[in-house]
Regions:
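Cofactor-binding loop segments of dinucleotide-utilizing enzymes, especially the Rossmann-like FAD-
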Residues: 49, 120, 212
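Cysteine-nucleophile active-site neighborhood
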Residues: 88-162
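Redox-cofactor binding/interface segments in oxidoreductases and associated redox assembly factors
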Residues: 84, 117, 210
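Flexible, glycine-rich phosphate/dinucleotide-binding loops
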Residues: 53, 76, 124, 131, ...
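Amide-donor transfer/coupling interface in amidating biosynthetic enzymes
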Residues: 1-35, 147-235
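Hydrophobic anchor at the start of a short beta-strand
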Residues: 67-68, 115, 207
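N-terminal beta1-alpha1 cap of cysteine-dependent amidohydrolase-like domains
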Residues: 1-98, 103-108, 220-235
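Short coil/turn connectors at secondary-structure junctions
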Residues: 41, 79, 111-113, 135-136, ...
């Protein structure tokens, strides 16, 4: 069963009564000591053009990966896996084009680079959008995705979600202006979790995508699963 946690009272800008901007799960994400990765740890990049970069870096490091920011094709060449974070998918897509990263990123993922897209990252990976909207997409994941399917920032909510392949009970995640999969377009896509009958976690080969923000709740199991995937694909 999916459990929804109420969010604190806040205004239209997401600020609570203290004037601070509220993000679901943010209470669990704070300053953490740097952890030196073990010898032989996989190098996992986080696309760092816009969006929720720092929390992904921290989660990956807690999972034992050597986590680095990726902003250029040269930096992309150094990683063994890539996380596409939440943020604003149109902005990230345009910055991918402007930075010269769009085609190199598409080709590396197509060639087998493990990729994990969350929220906006899922949108970028998708083959199609449900809305009539022109924006850059990588087009590698066989799904049709609807942007902002769960409402605006003020409609954000937390979920305890059962995810196929993740042990230890439901995973705590946050839906923040989240997309959802409207239609699976390929038999190669495996649905790992649903909300109200719509897929919200899918996998296609070495591509993992989630409609929510797993990085802000402190539950690192999806990141740990992705780091394990990256490690398993090494020569």
């Amino acid at each position: 069963m999916i459990a929804l946690d109420p969010t604190p009272d806040r205004d239209a800008h997401g600020r609570d009564g203290t004037g601070r901007r509220w993000t679901p799960g943010a209470r669990l994400v704070g300053d953490e000591p740097e952890v030196e990765p073990a010898d032989g740890a996989p190098t996992v990049g986080v696309l760092a053009l816009q969006g929720d970069v720092l929390e992904h870096l921290r989660a990956l490091r807690r999972c034992g990966a050597r986590a680095v920011e990726v902003r250029t094709p040269a930096e992309l060449d150094t990683v063994e896996g890539i996380v596409l974070p939440g943020g604003e998918s149109t902005t990230i897509g345009k910055l991918l084009e402007r930075s010269g990263l769009l085609e190199p990123l598409r080709e590396r993922i197509r060639a087998g680079l493990p990729a994990f897209g969350t929220c906006a990252g899922m949108i970028l990976l998708s083959a199609e959008l449900a809305q009539d909207r022109v924006q850059p997409l990588l087009g590698l994941l066989g799904v049709r995705t609807r942007r902002n399917a769960y409402g605006r920032q003020v409609d954000s909510f937390d979920v305890a979600l059962d995810v196929t392949g993740i042990d230890g009970g439901p995973v705590d995640v946050s839906f923040i202006r989240a997309p959802r999969v409207e239609e699976v377009l390929s038999d190669d896509v495996e649905v790992l979790a649903e909300v109200d009958g719509h897929p919200v976690v899918v996998r296609q080969g070495r591509i993992l995508a989630a409609a929510f923000h797993p990085e802000v709740t402190g539950d690192d199991r999806l990141h740990r699963s992705f780091v394990a995937l990256v490690s398993s694909t090494r020569d």
